Amino acid sequence: MQQKTIKLGNLEIANDKPFTLFGGMNVLESRDMAMAVCEKYVEVTNKLGVPYVFKASFDKANRSSIHSYRGPGMEEGLKIFQELKDTFGVKIITDVHEIYQCKPVAEVVDIIQLPAFLARQTDLVEAMARTGAVINVKKPQFLSPGQMGNIVEKIEECGNDQVILCDRGTNFGYDNLVVDMLGFSVMKQVSKGCPVIFDVTHSLQCRDPFGAASSGRRAQVTELARAGLAVGIAGLFLEAHPDPNNAKCDGPSALPLSTLEAFVGQMKAIDDLVKSFPEIDTSK
């Protein structure tokens, strides 16, 4: 099966090309922290020769608790994103939750993200598609990989074929997630070769049924990321934080920023090895 390539300037995102790191922080906590985190990612990815897209949310609209930090909002968030682009020359991905956000966000960032909880909301999907921007679709935790083809079709019916699919884990009973690596290939097939990326940090979430925030399994981020890249995919979606224990959102799943270079170095080695192998047709 031929793999589709998404081109963003000099970036080429595809399942059969060197992996792209979609990395940053969960939510914009401040302008200064965003600058520091982005600078570290740029330093590491430039040193290791890894294609890079900065990620962060300006509004976490689906927090568990009404009291949880959501972010600076769209207006302030877009100002920060523009400064990051001007300063570091990075491509940026962020999520939208409302139809009115689609056009102004797509005018600043390079990839707009359809959140997992909203991935079947047709009006939102259509509004995003009509911007013409590249769209990253998060697979809902409650949806099988095969059903992602229907979401891709909605986007393509609006005249937009610039689609990336992202796995962020699947419900395993109550308050737990697992990752089905076989689903990566299924998503490639039902989308006719769309790039598939793996959100390793969100896949490590654990829900506290009586708490106001998610827990996580940060200690397992390296082994899960290794397994995901071993399948042969287009990219890795990763959140890192200078002080994960005091992060305003999903700290228990975030990689300590100080370990970023060692982590990305391992991931590049695995991706290079896997993609050096010839494909073996075992379907006959």
UniProtKB/Swiss-Prot annotation:
The keyword Transferase applies. This is 2-dehydro-3-deoxyphosphooctonate aldolase. Signal peptide: none annotated. GO terms for cellular component: cytoplasm. InterPro entries: Aldolase_TIM, DAHP1/KDSA, KDO8P_synthase. It is found in: Cytoplasm. The keyword Chloroplast does not apply. It comes from Mannheimia haemolytica. Its main location: cytoplasm. GO terms for biological process: keto-3-deoxy-D-manno-octulosonic acid biosynthetic process. Keywords: Cytoplasm, Lipopolysaccharide biosynthesis, Transferase. Pathway: Carbohydrate biosynthesis; 3-deoxy-D-manno-octulosonate biosynthesis; 3-deoxy-D-manno-octulosonate from D-ribulose 5-phosphate: step 2/3; Bacterial outer membrane biogenesis; lipopolysaccharide biosynthesis. Its EC number is 2.5.1.55. NCBIfam families: KDO8P_synth (TIGR01362), PRK05198.1 (NF003543), PRK12457.1 (NF009109). The lineage of its organism: Bacteria, Pseudomonadati, Pseudomonadota, Gammaproteobacteria, Pasteurellales. It comes from the Bacteria. It catalyses: D-arabinose 5-phosphate + phosphoenolpyruvate + H2O = 3-deoxy-alpha-D-manno-2-octulosonate-8-phosphate + phosphate. It is an enzyme of class 2 (transferase). One of its GO terms (molecular function) is 3-deoxy-8-phosphooctulonate synthase activity. Belongs to the KdsA family.
